[in-house]
Amino acid sequence: MRTVSLFAEWDPKPDFVLGHKDKEGKSTYLGSKVWRNPQIKIVDKDVGEPGPTEVLIEVKACGVCGSDVHMLQTDDDGYIFYPGLTAFPCTLGHEFSGTVVKAGDKAINKRTGKKYDAGEAVCAEEMVWCSYCRPCADGFPNHCESLEEIGFSIDGAYAKYIIVDARYLWSIEGFRALHGEEKMYLLGSLVEPTSVAYNAVIERGGGIRPGENVVILGAGPVGAAACAILKRAGANAVILSEPSESRRKMAMSIGATHVIDPLKENVAERVLEITEGHGAGLILEATGLPSIVWKDVEKIIWEGRAVNTTVVVVARADDRIPLNGEVLQVRRANVVGAQGHSGHGTFPNVISCISSGMDVSPMITKKINLDEVEKNLVALQTDRDEVKITITNFE
């Protein structure tokens, strides 16, 4: 089968220190410090056979993630932008859904409690956690000490087929009755990024009390999905800051109640105006530009009457936050980081939300073939109008 794979050179920056979980020349948790001169190649690979607990899946839809873009995008010295766990060469693609082709005898379907049957529609977690290390045993699989990531450190779903252990799979058969088969798979490919948003605002951010105001900075897929989740959770004002007009309109269709163009308006002042000086109970930083947006974050906290605001940092960025501790102390505010989507009932809760009518499909703004991936990865480095480009043809 044909795959879209990324190759890069292991060439550590002078300040890079090999971590205890890094593997010299193979993998690192600090991708932007090591990998240089990335290239996309179409590579033929064997389909393979699933093991006893594994499932062979025919991929029906796979989203192009901003992380994929940043693994190809480089700085002036040729180093990739993506700062996280990576191992190359690797077939990209982690936001996918598909249908079961074949399953091992011990590959158990969580929906039925029995072995997976061929034809079951599924999506998958991207975080491949071990279940044995201390973080996993403590209930924090997103921080597994032996973590692998589909499409980052092990082969992903920019291919017609993928083999995944059943423990990371979730049935999306519940989408079929409400949405039909084609839309079922499109929505299935959005479960992963929507779960990243859910983990950020509900699990790590602690959720909200119905009637609270929230601010979302950035309307990429995670920011947009957060609008849908928080509106469904009972937020009063869901205020989105996003420079792209098309993204603002899309976000309004799935949950945002107010939108701000940060290129034309002062974000903090507009938030305080919309909330009549109250501010927000939760702020999501989903831009990846904390040094630019943080002044607005602190002004909302400092001048708003709301106490105990939680700021959740979800966008991956090799950038320092210009934090003022006094603002957090006086206003009893919190800053937390969010990574991943595994555990805590996140995937099944997101699937339940979509099954019962939370429609995040407006995020998909373009459908492409496998051959078109590279040019779209390049275009997305500068194009802010597309939200989610999705591969639907893998021939």
Predicted regions and their residues:
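Short, well-ordered coil/turn residues at beta-beta hairpins
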Residues: 61, 125, 284-286, 393
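A short N-terminal beta-strand-loop micro-motif at the entrance of redox/enzyme domains
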Residues: 11-61, 83, 87-91
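C-terminal hydrophobic helical "lid"/dimerization subdomain
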Residues: 17, 284, 294-306, 343-395
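Glycine-rich beta-strand-centered segment in the early N-terminal region that forms part
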Residues: 46-62, 77-134, 176
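Mid-domain Rossmann-like dinucleotide-binding core that forms the NAD(H)/NADP(H) cofactor-binding site
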Residues: 180-264, 269
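Glycine-rich cofactor phosphate-binding loops and adjacent beta1-alpha1 units
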Residues: 205-210, 233, 249-334
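NAD(P)H dinucleotide-binding glycine-rich loop of Rossmann-like/cofactor-binding domains
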Residues: 83-94, 109-110, 130-213, 217
